[in-house]
């Protein structure tokens, strides 16, 4: 009998556009794209393929339409030309989730987020504010805030301030169930354990 595994995949579909815009997008966002399949709906230019291989990104070239939920996003030009918001004017609010975040659920927020329940495998959290998880974290977290607080971590899919946590850093989080606070000084991640 043939042994197979079924997987759910999150993907970005990229339609035909200028290679320079695609290359700029890939260079700027390669850390976050590590967790996605990138689907090109055209034949990819060699210089774009070189960047995909350089960052070891998973990609597919196809003209075939794919089924699935679609999330409307900005064009690459709008994304790369968009001015950065001035965060100094308004302090983000805090949103508290007392429930578990299920597999397949995605939360995108400009607020600080506090999770009292578990974040299941296949769930994804992206926040411009600080993130605190006091349950078990098995899902993906992308935090752009000043700190990331985690208790019991069972995931290697953690990005803090545009930096993917290395295997060594993730291993420090897996050691025990104590609360860990992650901050960043310049380009150095600091992981402190609260006893």
Swiss-Prot record:
Pfam families: MinC_C. It comes from the Bacteria. It comes from Helicobacter pylori (strain G27). Cell division inhibitor that blocks the formation of polar Z ring septums. Rapidly oscillates between the poles of the cell to destabilize FtsZ filaments that have formed before they mature into polar Z rings. Prevents FtsZ polymerization. InterPro entries: CAP/MinC_C, MinC, MinC_C_sf, Septum_form_inhib_MinC_C. Interacts with MinD and FtsZ. Disulfide bonds: none annotated. GO terms for biological process: cell morphogenesis; division septum assembly; regulation of cell septum assembly. Keywords: Cell cycle, Cell division, Septation. This is Probable septum site-determining protein MinC. Belongs to the MinC family.
